[in-house]
């Protein structure tokens, strides 16, 4: 019982902590960097990206600073595609459990150039910008907090349901593996006994021919 409570507590802490992929990295011309995120079914996900301007005086980005972006589900058509852009954003609701991947490619350019990419990806309850909603609709702080808590509770429920499904899948896999191992052990035993019987028969035949028995 204590273990169950501890697991639920850890799950709540994990969901209340920021589930955000936020990074800044360098990417050379024609190179690709892919980032994956494990997302469960019906979870909301949003992301944004842009090339950091190397010009201190905020001049327009040079022609070499363009990227190609693709966001791919576990299977099926791409959820987002952008060709030769400087910045962009995407949003989707996951239609199946699995690993969703975002790939960013710097365009091929000579001479080779190094781009600095700023990438931000939020999933689940953290993808819903309640702060912006509160500002736009001018709701009071109490209503804002209630909405945030309700959204967190829903997210916890969905996460627990997802974990229960994964546990059932693992149990089914274990049962299937144990069954296969049992049949494999039985087959190995039959083969060993058959080989032992053939060896015994061969030795008996050999000794009879030699008239040793």
UniProtKB/Swiss-Prot annotation:
Q: Where are the transmembrane segments?
A: 181-203
Q: Which residues form the GOLD domain?
A: 32-148
Keyword list (alphabetical) reads: Coiled coil, Endoplasmic reticulum, ER-Golgi transport, Glycoprotein, Golgi apparatus, Membrane, Methylation, Protein transport, Signal, Transmembrane, Transmembrane helix, Transport
Glycosites: 97, 174
Coiled coil stretches, renumbered: 163-176
Which residues lie within the region annotated Interaction with ARF1? 202-213
Q: What is the lineage of its organism?
A: Eukaryota, Viridiplantae, Streptophyta, Embryophyta, Tracheophyta
Write out the function statement from the record. Answer: Involved in vesicular protein trafficking. Mainly functions in the early secretory pathway. Thought to act as cargo receptor at the lumenal side for incorporation of secretory cargo molecules into transport vesicles and to be involved in vesicle coat formation at the cytoplasmic side. On Golgi membranes, acts as a primary receptor for ARF1-GDP which is involved in COPI-vesicle formation.
Annotated compartments: Endoplasmic reticulum membrane; Golgi apparatus, cis-Golgi network membrane; Golgi apparatus, Golgi stack membrane
- The protein's name is Transmembrane emp24 domain-containing protein p24delta8
Sorted alphabetically, which InterPro entries does this protein's record hold?
A: Emp24-like (IPR015720), GOLD_dom (IPR009038)
Main subcellular location: endoplasmic reticulum
Per the record, residues carrying Omega-N-methylated arginine are: 166
| Residue span of motif COPI vesicle coat-binding | 206-213
Q: Cytoplasmic topology: which positions?
A: 204-213
Signal peptide range: 1-22
Q: Which residues lie on this side of the membrane: Lumenal?
A: 23-180
Q: What is stated as this protein's family in its record?
A: Belongs to the EMP24/GP25L family.
As for membrane topology, the entry says: Single-pass type I membrane protein
Any Gene Ontology CC annotation: Golgi cisterna membrane
User: Record's Pfam families?
Assistant: EMP24_GP25L
Q: By its UniProt entry, which PANTHER family does this protein fall under?
A: TRANSMEMBRANE EMP24 DOMAIN-CONTAINING PROTEIN (PTHR22811)
Task: Give residue numbers for sequence motif COPII vesicle coat-binding.
Answer: 206-207
GO biological-process terms attached to the record? protein transport; vesicle-mediated transport
Q: How does it assemble?
A: Probably oligomerizes with other members of the EMP24/GP25L family. Associates with the COPI vesicle coat (coatomer). Associates with the COPII vesicle coat (coatomer). Interacts with ARF1 (GDP-bound).
Q: Which organism is it from?
A: Arabidopsis thaliana
């Amino acid at each position: 019982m204590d273990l169950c409570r501890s697991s639920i507590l850890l799950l709540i802490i994990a969901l209340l902590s920021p589930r955000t992929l936020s990074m800044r990295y360098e990417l050379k011309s024609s190179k690709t960097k892919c980032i994956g995120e494990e997302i469960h079914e019906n979870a909301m996900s949003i992301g944004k990206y842009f090339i950091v301007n190397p010009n201190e005086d905020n001049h327009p980005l040079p022609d070499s600073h363009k990227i190609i972006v693709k966001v791919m589900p576990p299977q099926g058509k791409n959820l987002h595609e952008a060709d030769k852009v400087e910045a962009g954003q995407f949003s989707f609701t996951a239609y199946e459990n699995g690993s969703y991947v975002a790939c960013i490619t710097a365009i091929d350019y000579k001479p080779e150039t190094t781009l600095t990419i700023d990438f931000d990806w939020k999933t689940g309850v953290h993808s819903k910008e309640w702060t912006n909603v509160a500002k736009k609709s001018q709701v009071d702080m109490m209503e804002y907090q209630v909405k945030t808590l309700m959204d967190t509770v829903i997210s916890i429920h969905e996460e627990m349901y997802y974990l229960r499904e994964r546990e059932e899948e693992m149990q089914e896999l274990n049962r299937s593996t144990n069954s296969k191992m049992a049949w494999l052990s039985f087959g190995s035993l039959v083969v060993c006994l058959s080989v032992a019987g053939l060896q015994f028969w061969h030795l008996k035949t050999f000794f009879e021919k030699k008239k040793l028995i």
